[in-house]
């Protein structure tokens, strides 16, 4: 599987693992559902599809989107979780080392909220990536207004 299918709608990715504390993983799943982020795992829990499905059902009671995609961990040089990534569509162009060009994405790691990650990326990233982060923050602000139908 390639990064291509993420290009159009997945500019916000949260890299996670079932080794993370359950309360943190549940909270990130809740935030991912609210913000439209996709949660990405490196592989199966206990090398079992059934165990992975069961763990995802327990952790993801809000219905956030999940995927198992080890290549994305490499593409975005993710070595710890949680890591938050904002990526431009051209992040799919992979270099010889299997990584996306540094100018096409920005990441931040740590036990922080998705909003804090987006705001930090907005302030620190290159202009194109900062613009994506700002647009995502604006959608979140609009969606959180009372009576909003923005998703």
Model features per residue range: what roles?
Residues 82-96:
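A short, hydrophobic beta-strand/beta-hairpin element that forms part of a small beta-sheet core
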Residues 74-76, 84-86, 116:
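Residues in flexible loops and secondary-structure boundaries
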Residues 1-13, 18-59, 92-151:
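Non-globular targeting/processing and membrane-anchoring segments
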Residues 56-81:
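Thioredoxin-like thiol-disulfide oxidoreductase module
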């Amino acid at each position: 599987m390639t990064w291509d299918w993420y290009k159009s709608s997945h500019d916000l990715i949260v890299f996670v693992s079932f080794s993370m504390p359950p309360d943190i993983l549940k909270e990130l799943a809740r935030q991912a559902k609210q913000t439209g982020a996709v949660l990405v795992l490196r592989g199966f829990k206990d090398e079992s599809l059934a165990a992975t499905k069961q763990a995802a059902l327990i952790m993801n009671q809000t219905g956030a989107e999940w995927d198992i995609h080890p290549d994305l961990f490499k593409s975005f040089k993710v070595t710890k979780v949680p890591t938050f990534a904002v990526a431009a569509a051209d992040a799919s162009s992979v270099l010889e080392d299997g990584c996306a060009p540094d100018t096409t994405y920005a990441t931040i790691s740590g036990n922080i909220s998705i909003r804090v990650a987006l705001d930090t990326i907005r302030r620190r990233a290159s202009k194109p990536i900062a613009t994506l982060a700002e647009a995502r923050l604006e959608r979140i602000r609009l969606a959180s207004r009372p009576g909003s139908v923005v998703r």
